[in-house]
Amino acid sequence: MIPADIIASIAGLVNEKDIEKITSEYQDNIWEFVESLVTHVLASNHVGYSDYNTSSFISEELARQKLSCGLNIPNAVSKSLWALHLAHEHVEKLKDLSDIPPIGYRVILEFYLVWQQLLIDPEETIRTEIEPIMEKLRVLIAEENDAFTSEDRCQIQLEMAAVRFQFYEYDKADNLIKSASEECQLNMDLSGMMGKRTRFQQRDIAQLVLIHKDPSTTGTPLPPDSDIPQSLDMNDDTLLEQVAITEQGARVDGRTLNACQLSCLLWIARHESATHRHDVLVHERCSPVLDTVIAARRYWSIQAAALLARAELERGRVRQVDRSCTQSELVVKLQQGVDDPVLIKDRLLRTSYILASGLTPFWQSSVLLAGILNSLGCTSEALLILEKLEMWDGVIDCYKQLGQMDKAETLIRRLIEQKPNDSMLHVYLGDITRNLEYFTKAIELSDDRNARAHRSLGHLLLMDKKFEEAYKHLRRSLELQPIQLGTWFNAGYCAWKLENFKESTQCYHRCVSLQPDHFEAWNNLSAAYIRHGQKPKAWKLLQEALKYNYEHPNVWENYMLLSVDVGEFSQAIQAYHRLLDMNKRGADDEVLELIAQTLLRREAEISMDESEDKAQNEAENRKEKEEMIKLLARISANHQTLSPKTLRVYALLKKPSVLSSETRTEFEKYVRLLEKSLAAANGKLTWPKEEKLALEVVETAVRLAEDRLELAKFIASDTSVKEASAKVRLSLRGILTRLDKDSGSRVSGDETEKLQEIVEVAKSLLDSVAI
């Protein structure tokens, strides 16, 4: 590593020739020289190192302009941009050399990652530049190149995972995290152990904890570092500071883990939080992981990253949000070098594992703090933080919450007076006033390069239901900046309204790739595929939507109907149960009849089948029949009225295939259900006048009569056949009389011949039981 005093020497130089002279002295160690510059940028923005944040040879404002990618500029308060600019110049000269050593590829990776961290938005050109570098590093790691130790390989993979996170490529990040975990032999899993969570808990219940898959891998606890951010207590009158585990087991002790293992755990929790809807389950899964990392009390950057991740996780929980606020405030102060008792020169020791742990720059951590303060109602305090960061978007939102939009407008107009050619300020003014002219002005000032102006204009036109114009501006915005979370969703919605379903699906696909937990996008994507006629694919997409919002009745209803359409009846039944759980569904006779009739038809087809899969098909159909019977029983038990047709298929589902002494009880239940079906159908006064209804009633009556007589003959008691015959006579006579009485008013249709045939069967049955 290049000595730290070289940074001091360079920062004090006033012309570039002197800088070139110093650089030439380190030509043999040029990659270490560039690495020192990158490390200095990290120290200035992440760990509170406040020396040499500016230089004499270039102003920070000029360095910011040189590091800008169009309108995508480094944050206004980011520090030591002079060092990053100098590193950039060297990387541009060195990256195309044919003999780059392994350490060189790693330095280039870290440079681009730091540059991207300091930019306001994800930058597509950086992603393009960094892809071949990461591919080369992947090959070097796979070959187990001697230039990298096992620890180096683990760190590099986590740094590449950090790059993937910057561009919302969570699947690729997940693969890298898993590879890094294997490299550092992290062999752990979440499991339940008995314990207590609250001060008043009398009985142990299962708590989620991190355990060793192989207990023999447990190491010896290591002492904590002296320079480490403090982990604050909750000081809650109900919750314990730590879950008290009473069961003996292979629970992970964070003090036994090395830096790579702790960093991997951080990324595992971060990936879980980023790819799942924020609910109780995600909190339960991430908390044990973060608690394990925090318990280690080692490595400043890892500890700070873990404390910020815990603050982010706890911000939505009533009993923990106070700690979330104070903890993030403490870490932000240390990152800015405020109220830090450690000597400035000693803070350089904190820079190890900054990128591997995913520690954010101080200004991003400050945004987290502002968000937590805002959620607590401390909007004025959040406003002050965002003003210092010059994050005018957030400032406008705070003024909006305070009901002081006039102050926001005054502020932005004053800034425009100072910088009249700053197109972003005109966009902010357009957001405040909702005046299209300001967006148009911003587009003109930027030579049509302002993605934010097109986005805001598109959103405003969308609100006015001018979908065609809105779509044009949203697509232009996405051409300029493809990585925008809400914009892809809105573009997909506009395309849907314009009935351009192909482009709608493309937009929603990009939306869910950037935001896997965006359940509305999953739902809309499924709807677009239905319009395309691709129902099986739409069905699978709805499954993804339900992962991220398990409580949305409309999505469950869509999933139920689509499951019926694609023949996934088991899933349709499960969805119906879920709707009943939410009290959002009564008896949908059409759906119930369709499922039941299909199962009965499939059962008949399987019985005629002679293929090798017959046994398996019978087992699957039997299982679905049992699930359907349970569903119908639940609906009946809830006193919900079923239609005669549904009662009939319910009865047929319950009917045993063979009447025997073992199945007699089930057969009697089947007969009673068929009686209910006939009574419900016969109760409709108009059925004799409607040919289709008349056919259903007579068919049910005939089936009931036949099965009644069959049961009576099986019982074979003195009175059973007489009683059954009497019931058959009473039932069939009444039905045939009503049918004959209204025959003149019944309109003949396609079922006339079939009705006549079943009437003849009924008359024959009646004759057979005549006295």
Swiss-Prot record:
The TPR repeat ranges on this chain: 389-415, 416-449, 451-484, 485-518, 520-552, 553-586
Keywords: Cytoplasm, Differentiation, Repeat, TPR repeat
Record GO cellular component, one term: cytoplasm
Location(s) in or outside the cell: Cytoplasm
GO biological process terms on file: cell differentiation
Disruption phenotype: High level of lethality with a significant reduction in seam cell number. RNAi-mediated knockdown results in defects linked to cell fate determination including impaired hypodermal differentiation, fewer seam cells, possibly due to a change in cell fate, a molting defect in 10% of animals and male tail abnormalities, including reduced sensory ray number. The germline exhibits a mog (masculinization of the germline) phenotype with increased sperm numbers and largely absent oocytes in the gonad.
SMART domains reported for this sequence: TPR
Main subcellular location: cytoplasm
DNA-binding keyword on record: no
Tissue expression notes: Expressed in the spermatheca.
Record-stated family: Belongs to the TTC27 family.
Function: Developmental protein required for cell fate determination in both the germline and seam cells of the developing epidermis. Specifically, involved in sex determination and may function in parallel or downstream of other sex determination factors, including tra-2 and fem-3, to promote oogenesis in its role in the regulation of the switch from spermatogenesis to oogenesis in the gonads. Also implicated in the mitosis to meiosis switch in distal tip cells.
PANTHER family to which the protein is assigned, alphabetical: TETRATRICOPEPTIDE REPEAT PROTEIN 27 (PTHR16193:SF0)
Protein name: Tetratricopeptide repeat-containing protein trd-1
Gene: trd-1
